[in-house]
């Protein structure tokens, strides 16, 4: 008989199994002869078993009895048309990570599987009342349940733990596994987001006519779940599905578990949201700083630089995806535009603040709106001008006769009186003497009836020195009036700058408030806060 003969090969395999399973000693003579591969399984006669054997020997005999001629590659059904019903359940031990960038969820789970194998039945009374036995899973038939939406790593179970056999033929197998499943991450409401990640389990090669799945429980077992510091499992339910794929004509069953997980936002609130709100508040305070303060533009630039550095630091925190813009990303972009606009507006306000009549002319609409109605709407009350500015300068410097009389030099006054008397006798006015009326008008060289009329009206005749002095006084008065007018216009420009600052102060407060509400309101309405 050649080595290629099937009978010889079968005999060789049985001999090897017998040598491996037979303990040392002379037990071979007490064992029943090996069965042929085609013989049906039958329990040995109780009379052939030693009655006083130990539990270890009994378990050893049971092991040999079960796997004598057992084929682990064939489905455990009496007829090929029968269906193996696999009861499937899932228990999660830990939610390890949710990778937003690579769109996958890493979990540590236990796959609970249970089916019936008619070839692994025995009568407990024949084997010392042993009702269950634990055997290596590599020695029995196991369903090829895999994770359909696997993203990285092994699709099937890699750690082949032992299976638990029962005398009724029921096989219970709970292997642990670490899976990286694909998950469509939606970071629209980050960091107040809620994700729906699914895990789809099913047989890879057997269709529904060969293996059918049945759920042990409708929900995922969370009894042994270790709480995550970043995510909380809101709900985890399983559904049974049957689907026909394009590759095959058969229908394949699967059990899909949907994990509703919610991100815990405390870390991002402390390290992301609150700093953004504080930077926005600093931007608002820029418009409350007086324009004559030299640190106004410095504060704007400092806020912008701090925001830029802050954005560089949090690039690793924000999910790096281009599918959608996270809500916090929109808020950061809004804050950046907010600060940039504040710098532009501050430069414009400083330009308005330092305007003068020599460089700019204030338009009438600016004077009517920004100096008239707008301050009243903003509840701004401009203080009235000082009291001395309300009276013209020439009223205080009125060159009346009595005023001049009290200030003219006594010697000069005597000379003037002598000249008046001397020329009055002749009926003339002194030619070298001018006159000053009580209204401040200077007349020089008046004579004849006109001079007499002027004297009757109370005019004072002045010398050339007094004439020059009064001209100087008038020049100074005109110059002071011009300076007062220029100063008034400058103050108007400064007040216009203050009004513009106040307008943007309220505008930025409203925009900052609405932006903050826009950050928290959508996830609040969606029930994520």
Swiss-Prot record:
MF term (GO), any: acetylcholine receptor activity
Disulfide bonds: 183-197, 247-248
Any one Gene Ontology cellular component term annotated for this protein: synapse
Ranges of the Cytoplasmic topological domain: 353-502
Compartment(s) of residence: Synaptic cell membrane; Cell membrane
Stretch list, region Disordered: 27-56
UniProt keyword Lyase present: no
Gene3D superfamilies registered for this protein in UniProt: Neurotransmitter-gated ion-channel ligand-binding domain, Neurotransmitter-gated ion-channel transmembrane domain
Residues the record marks as carrying a glycan: 79, 129, 235
Signal peptide from the UniProt entry: 1-26
Residue ranges that the UniProt entry lists as topological domain Extracellular: 27-264
Catalysed reactions, semicolon-separated: Ca(2+)(in) = Ca(2+)(out); K(+)(in) = K(+)(out); Na(+)(in) = Na(+)(out)
Keywords, in A-Z order: Cell membrane, Disulfide bond, Glycoprotein, Ion channel, Ion transport, Ligand-gated ion channel, Membrane, Receptor, Signal, Synapse, Transmembrane, Transmembrane helix, Transport
GO biological process: acetylcholine receptor signaling pathway; membrane depolarization; monoatomic ion transmembrane transport; neuromuscular synaptic transmission; response to nicotine; synaptic transmission, cholinergic
Family: Belongs to the ligand-gated ion channel (TC 1.A.9) family. Acetylcholine receptor (TC 1.A.9.1) subfamily. Alpha-2/CHRNA2 sub-subfamily.
Function summary: Component of neuronal acetylcholine receptors (nAChRs) that function as pentameric, ligand-gated cation channels with high calcium permeability among other activities. nAChRs are excitatory neurotrasnmitter receptors formed by a collection of nAChR subunits known to mediate synaptic transmission in the nervous system and the neuromuscular junction. Each nAchR subunit confers differential attributes to channel properties, including activation, deactivation and desensitization kinetics, pH sensitivity, cation permeability, and binding to allosteric modulators.
Subunit structure and binding partners: Neuronal AChR is composed of two different types of subunits: alpha and non-alpha (beta). CHRNA2/alpha-2 subunit can be combined to CHRNB2/beta-2 or CHRNB4/beta-4 to give rise to functional receptors. Both CHRNA2:CHRNB2 and CHRNA2:CHRNB4 nAChR complexes are heteropentamers with two subtypes: LS (low agonist sensitivity) with a (CHRNA2)3:(CHRNB2/4)2 and HS (high agonist sensitivity) with a (CHRNA2)2:(CHRNB2/4)3 stoichiometries; the subtypes differ in their subunit binding interfaces which are involved in ligand binding.
The protein's name in its UniProt record: Neuronal acetylcholine receptor subunit alpha-2
Annotated organism of origin: Pan troglodytes (Chimpanzee)
The encoding gene: CHRNA2
């Amino acid at each position: 008989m050649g080595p290629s003969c099937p009978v010889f090969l079968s005999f060789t395999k049985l001999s090897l199994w017998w040598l491996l399973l037979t303990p040392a000693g002379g037990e071979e003579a007490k064992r029943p002869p090996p069965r042929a591969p085609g013989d049906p399984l039958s329990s040995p006669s109780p009379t052939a078993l030693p009655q006083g054997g130990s539990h270890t020997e009994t378990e050893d005999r049971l092991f040999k009895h079960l796997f004598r001629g057992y084929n682990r590659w064939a489905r455990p059904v009496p007829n090929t048309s029968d269906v193996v019903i696999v009861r499937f359940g899932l228990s999660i031990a830990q939610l390890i990570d949710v990778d937003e960038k690579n769109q996958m969820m890493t979990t540590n789970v236990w796959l609970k599987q249970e089916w019936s194998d008619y070839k692994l039945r025995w009568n407990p009374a024949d084997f010392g009342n042993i009702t269950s036995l634990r055997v290596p899973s590599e020695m029995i038939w196991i369903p090829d349940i895999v994770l359909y939406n696997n993203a990285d790593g092994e699709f099937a179970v890699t750690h082949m733990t032992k299976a638990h056999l029962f005398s009724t033929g029921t096989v219970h197998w709970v292997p642990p596994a670490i899976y990286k499943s694909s998950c469509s991450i939606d970071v629209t409401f980050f960091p107040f987001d809620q994700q729906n990640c699914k895990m789809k389990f099913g047989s890879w090669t057997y269709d529904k006519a060969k293996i059918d799945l049945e759920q042990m429980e409708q929900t995922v077992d969370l009894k042994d779940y270790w709480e995550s510091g970043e995510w909380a499992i809101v709900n985890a339910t399983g559904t049974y599905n049957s689907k026909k794929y394009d590759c095959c004509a058969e229908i394949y069953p699967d059990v899909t578990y949907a994990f509703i997980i919610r991100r815990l936002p405390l870390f991002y609130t402390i390290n992301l949201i609150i700093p953004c709100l504080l930077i926005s508040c600093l931007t608002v305070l820029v418009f409350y700083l007086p324009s004559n303060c030299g640190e106004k533009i410095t504060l704007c630039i400092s806020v912008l630089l701090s925001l830029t550095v802050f954005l560089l630091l949090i690039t690793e925190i924000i999910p790096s995806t281009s599918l959608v813009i996270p809500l916090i990303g929109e808020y950061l972009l809004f804050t950046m535009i907010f600060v940039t606009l504040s710098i532009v507006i501050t430069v414009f306000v400083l330009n308005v603040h330092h305007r003068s009549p020599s460089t700019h002319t204030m338009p009438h609409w600016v004077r009517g709106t920004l100096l008239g109605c707008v301050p009243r709407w903003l509840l701004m009350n401009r203080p009235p001008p000082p009291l001395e500015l309300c009276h013209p300068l020439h009223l205080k410097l009125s060159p009346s006769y009595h005023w001049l009389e009290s200030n003219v030099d006594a010697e000069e006054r005597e000379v003037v009186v002598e000249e008046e008397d001397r020329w009055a006798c002749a009926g003339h006015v002194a030619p070298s003497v001018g006159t000053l009326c009580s209204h401040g008008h200077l007349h020089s060289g008046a004579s004849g009836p006109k001079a007499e009329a002027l004297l009757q009206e109370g005019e004072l005749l002045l010398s050339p020195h007094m004439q020059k002095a009064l001209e100087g006084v008038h020049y100074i008065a005109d110059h002071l009036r011009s300076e007062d007018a220029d100063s008034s216009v400058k103050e108007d420009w400064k007040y216009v700058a203050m009004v513009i600052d106040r307008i943007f102060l309220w505008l930025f407060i409203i925009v900052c408030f609405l932006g903050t509400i826009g950050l928290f309101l959508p996830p609040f309405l969606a029930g994520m806060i």
